[in-house]
Amino acid sequence: MWFKNLTVYRFNKPFSVDTESMEKSLEDFTFSPCSSQDISKFGFSNAFGKHGDTLVHTAADRHLICATKEEKILPAQVIKEALEEKVALLESEDGRKLAKKEKDALKDEITTTLLPRAFSRRSQIRALILPEIQMILVDSSSAAKSEELMALLRKAIGTLPIIPMSFKTPIETQLTEWLKESKTPAPFEMQDEAELKSDSDEGGIVRFKQQDLSENEVLAHIEVGKQVHKLALHFGQSVAFLLQSDAAIKRLKFSEEFRAGNDDLGNEDPMARLDADFALMGSELIALVNAVVEALGGLEDSI
């Protein structure tokens, strides 16, 4: 349940959530497994998985949702080889070359035949809807997967006035200044990882890991025009993460001390523990995002 990445959206129109109404809206788009002829299926599932029984889990006007995706694993090479074999056989029998339309029809036929025997894989993606800061935080490092979830949510509830989080000042400009000065705004602390990139195609990319970023070797790249596009940071004593110039927050890692904040509850009641951890995580993520927005100079005005 602890988020590992953040793709952040903000509402560009005031948005509130009625939990009961949202629950009913999501019920029409619940996940169901692939049938023999389905390539993939995507739908909402219980927010707390096997420990929950609602699609929306709400606490303190913070709303957790989850979607499950099942995909059939049908390697393109398998289809290609089967198609080539079938085409060769038919062309030999008919004594002519098959047209593209005929090959496309054969490909569809082969796919239909192979689908029932294909293995499948499942994945889940969660999002935190936060009316109090007018944002949605998606636990994904993939912009495409985040957009897929937002599209499903929009389809379910009818409207979702959101835009990706963006800032008044380019993020790479701020990150470069922090690295150049070896100083970050409180409560952030710079760690030992960064990626610098040149604006020109010829300039290249340089990555540093487990290295003191204040060393001249690192700063020399800024002097020749490279900018910082990824920077590892720590938020107070609670969360380590990688901030990127596209506003993605990746590799979230909550400290053991922070995660132990609810250890006094034990694990005898899984639902109670999940609910407590959800509250703990939600509050810290809100604090983190608000601090990032302030440190980077504020959000870009919405259109």
Swiss-Prot record:
Pfam family of the protein (one): RdgC
Principal place of residence: cytoplasm
Keyword annotations from UniProtKB, A to Z: Cytoplasm, DNA recombination
Subcellular location: Cytoplasm, Nucleoid
Superkingdom as given in the UniProt entry: Bacteria
A GO CC term attached to the entry: cytoplasm
Gene Ontology terms describing biological process: DNA recombination; regulation of DNA recombination
Gene Ontology MF terms: double-stranded DNA binding
Physiological role: May be involved in recombination.
Protein family per UniProt: Belongs to the RdgC family.
HAMAP family: RdgC
Protein name per the record: Recombination-associated protein RdgC
Organism: Shewanella piezotolerans (strain WP3 / JCM 13877)
